[in-house]
Amino acid sequence: MRGVMIGGTGMTRFGKYPDASIRSLVQEALHEALGDARIGPAEVETVFFGNAAAGLLTGQEMITGQVALRDSGLLGKPIINVENACASASSAAHLAWLSVASGQAEVALAIGAEKMTHADKSVPFRALIAAMDLEEIRAETGSDDPLTAGSAPGRSGFMDIYAERPGALPAV
């Protein structure tokens, strides 16, 4: 493996952007990152696009990165979509690092984008529920719906499934 450096970074300010699309949020961060690296899209060899919930919130499945990057000058290059729940962007960054470290690419781009707001507040909540082990919930509760499966007062379905012993979760 060879040494790798991060040549540039960019970020859209965290916040709620009800009228913005993932594409518009990505364009802002991408423009900043490429400018910081002092390169253009032509110099990028491969892209790793991290996103977990776009399909559930917008209906856009399978080609989320390709759609978000349509106007970026990156189409025609490999755009690999990475879905790994809350670690999607971190996983994309790891894969970009590995691509350069292994010699597969000289310049790789990692992008993470998520928009967890929706006019119907139950939609992002359902997206978070989809990140739970639904098969395990069914086996333990007999319910197909984690919202109605029930938890003890002061607890959540996440605690029932993922906290293996009392006190396993730190006090907040």
Region roles according to the model:
Residues 1-5, 17, 54-107, 118-120, ...:
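Conserved catalytic cysteine-centered active-site region
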Residues 7, 33, 44-47, 89, ...:
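Buried hydrophobic positions in well-ordered alpha/beta secondary-structure cores of metabolic enzymes
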Residues 7-8, 108-114:
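Short beta-strand segments
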Residues 9-14:
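Short polar catalytic/cofactor-binding loops
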Residues 20, 24-27, 43-49, 55, ...:
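Metallocofactor- and cofactor-centric catalytic cores in central/energy metabolism, strongly enriched
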Residues 20-37, 68-73:
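Short catalytic helix/loop segments, enriched in acidic residues and glycine
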Residues 31-45, 169-172:
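Phosphate/pyrophosphate-binding loops at sites that engage ATP/ADP/AMP, CoA/4′-phosphopantetheine
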Residues 50, 83, 111:
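Conserved residues at the C-terminal ends of beta-strands
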